[in-house]
């Protein structure tokens, strides 16, 4: 999807239009790119942000209910400082580079997952990249999203999270059936994107839907290359460098076959390296 900079309503309409086309092609799970509604609209950040409950997210919930599907992506979330304390994430407040005023809002890159009209779960990006740290607080939880109707678990990553193998590994160890990454990887990092997306699938023996935006922003451009990858690491569908819809019927049971063939999880020797991973 080519995200129009700071143009929330137009992006929502485009996302719903493309999502409907995807459903008509047989899609049951739809993934939108990172901050699909506005892009990184720092110059109008407060306007770009969604305060829950959000009319924009309600539109997506209604779409998922009307079409009996799952829809995922991310938006900018605005949270009052009082709410931060209420939900028990003071560490985020302390680490934030935003104002420390008691009335100052906090912002997150919020990943959402609607299943047939219900918010199945959400995820706040845990690894903001460079400039993002000047605007976003860090999420403090990495857990799969459980879908009740589909009876499966989805591991959710947002963009820069993809560069940290620990994230996908933790999600896989927690029982994820599928990995989903929503991203805004810019040029000239297409080769990194291609390799990392496949690597997370191969090393965890898990299917991976990796959705990356395309188009231009004021300070960079994006290459797309959204992919659907199976548990063997084989790319089953690739959007290339254009705005389009890709659909593929993923066999989620393939994960179990691959793990029997190459028992990586059984053969791990965590006693040799688990503590070393904490060393800087």
Residue ranges and their predicted role:
Residues 38, 45, 112, 123-129, ...:
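Short beta->alpha transition motifs characteristic of CBS
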Residues 49, 62, 81, 86-88, ...:
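Active-site catalytic loop in hydrolytic enzyme cores
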Residues 110, 122-124, 181, 238, ...:
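Residue-level detector of high-confidence beta-strand sites
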Residues 144, 213-280:
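C-terminal beta-strand edge segments of enzyme domains
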Residues 6-8, 12, 16-116, 186-206:
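Cys-nucleophile CN-hydrolase/nitrilase-fold catalytic domain and related Cys-dependent amidase chemistry
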Residues 1-5:
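Generic N-terminal amphipathic, Lys/Arg-enriched alpha-helix
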Residues 53-72, 163-245:
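CN hydrolase (nitrilase-like) catalytic-core segments centered on the catalytic cysteine
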